[in-house]
Amino acid sequence: MGYLNSVLSSSSQVHSDDGPVSGGGLSQNGKFSYGYASSPGKRSSMEDFYETRIDGVEGEIVGLFGVFDGHGGARAAEYVKQNLFSNLIRHPKFISDTTAAIADAYNQTDSEFLKSENSQNRDAGSTASTAILVGDRLLVANVGDSRAVICRGGNAIAVSRDHKPDQSDERQRIEDAGGFVMWAGTWRVGGVLAVSRAFGDRLLKQYVVADPEIQEEKVDSSLEFLILASDGLWDVVSNEEAVGMIKAIEDPEEGAKRLMMEAYQRGSADNITCVVVRFFSDQAGGIGSSSTNIPIDHGIVPDRISGDSST
């Protein structure tokens, strides 16, 4: 277990309302690299957070990546960023039953956030789109409308579903719980919230749950890369466009920056956060093999978008 101490790494996000930040890391055993880019975009405040983390659990090296898009302020997204993955890796079944551990960690984090805030930040909530790498397994979980897309065999494949109130099953769940969905510029829970699942949202908690949908993918030679992003990207860039834009960009940090800048240039009105994880073709043993993974964090590098006039 001694070697695990040398591989623990986490992004140290600077929450900045001033301009874009980016960074990334590389596993020394050549299994994967990752990059992130985040910008307030045209907004004057920043409610997006991200997390990139390498950790050791029961002798296994795991990668944890997430994008958290806040609403009603930044507090809920910040809390989820700080606590979700810690709760997950402490779960006693994290390795033996990862899917159950993820579901429990999501709900534990939601419950603890609501308790910690008491009656404060009653409108604060957050989406989450997360990817967990354990050996040759990739588990993607989400609540809300931050999306995960993979490139497998050259094709863009969504591996998460946006949780919107007008989806028939989501609307039925909300109505069965005593809530309602109505049109107010877009379909909203209680005429207020445009996502049907989220962390926080105390006043709507009976209807807006933090139960994640989880999808598992095998990490093999056909899996090229993963994109996690807030809706600041997906509102203006399709899954296929996003994959096509960065397919030839080997550096995932540069790929994340490319997506962020494209969304800004297309007029995205929201904060924009992207995480890209690129897998290499030799996947024998997955990322948790006995070779030591030492991420090389490039750090957070300010990189203002040309012509940025954040408002």
Curated annotation (Swiss-Prot):
Compositionally biased intervals (Low complexity): 1-14
Stored CDD domains: PP2Cc
Binding locations of Mn(2+) 2: D69, D231, D270
EC number: 3.1.3.16
Keyword hit for Repeat: no
Catalytic activity: O-phospho-L-seryl-[protein] + H2O = L-seryl-[protein] + phosphate; O-phospho-L-threonyl-[protein] + H2O = L-threonyl-[protein] + phosphate
Cofactor: Mg(2+); Mn(2+)
Function noted in UniProt: Protein phosphatase that modulates defense response to pathogenic bacteria, conferring resistance and promoting salicylic acid (SA) accumulation.
Family: Belongs to the PP2C family.
Protein name: Probable protein phosphatase 2C 59
Gene name as annotated: WIN2
